[in-house]
């Protein structure tokens, strides 16, 4: 999972009821410096070329599945990640808003947006500019739509994936709540033998 939403990734990864086959994937370029503080947000989001090096240095392999999230689908680094992952034989699924993506221009040098680079796009149906609500006296809308929608979609996908694995005779590791009696002990029996050997 990369860039979906911190709260959603936390809702899926390492929590009670969550499968162990999901792992967080993130990266950034950090340069040691003694100069003045500079806002790097625009640089980090629109830097092309870094994804290829990051993927080669990662443990991802052909046949793995990478979920990539960007509501607008135009951020260059996200598009670059999807492009480079596909070149490696990784299946790429996007979580994006088609309404938003079609309302903005691409930033990536290919002239493409995220949904045009992936194997499958899950449309979270967020409006352009993301938010749903408006109030008189405030120019910006509020209440982002993508979080709730993406959470629902990803848990639906997860449920289908678990059912499909079971049909194939594969029992995926599902974590119990650490706050439930015996939860931690059970989780050790699931994570250590399953994930390290099989990835599920």
Predicted regions and their residues:
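Active-site phosphate/pyrophosphate-binding segments
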Residues: 17-18, 163-200
């Amino acid at each position: 999972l990369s860039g979906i939403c911190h709260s959603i990734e936390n809702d899926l990864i390492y929590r009670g009821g969550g499968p162990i086959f999901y792992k967080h994937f993130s990266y950034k370029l950090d340069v040691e410096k003694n100069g003045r503080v500079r806002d790097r947000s625009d640089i980090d989001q629109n830097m092309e070329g870094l994804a290829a090096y990051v993927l080669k240095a990662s443990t991802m392999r052909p046949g793995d599945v990478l979920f990539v999230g960007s509501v607008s689908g135009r951020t260059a680094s996200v598009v670059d990640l999807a492009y480079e992952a596909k070149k490696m034989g990784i299946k790429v699924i996007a979580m994006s808003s088609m309404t938003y993506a079609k309302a903005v221009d691409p930033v990536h040098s290919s002239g493409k947006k995220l949904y045009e680079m992936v194997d499958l796009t899950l449309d979270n149906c967020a409006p352009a500019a993301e938010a749903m609500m408006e109030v008189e006296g405030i120019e910006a809308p509020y209440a982002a739509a993508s979080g709730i929608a993406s959470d629902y979609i990803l848990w639906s996908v997860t449920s289908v994936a678990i059912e499909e694995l079971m049909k194939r005779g594969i029992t995926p590791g599902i974590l119990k709540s650490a706050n439930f009696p015996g939860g931690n002990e059970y989780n050790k029996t699931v994570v250590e033998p399953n994930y390290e050997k099989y990835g599920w």
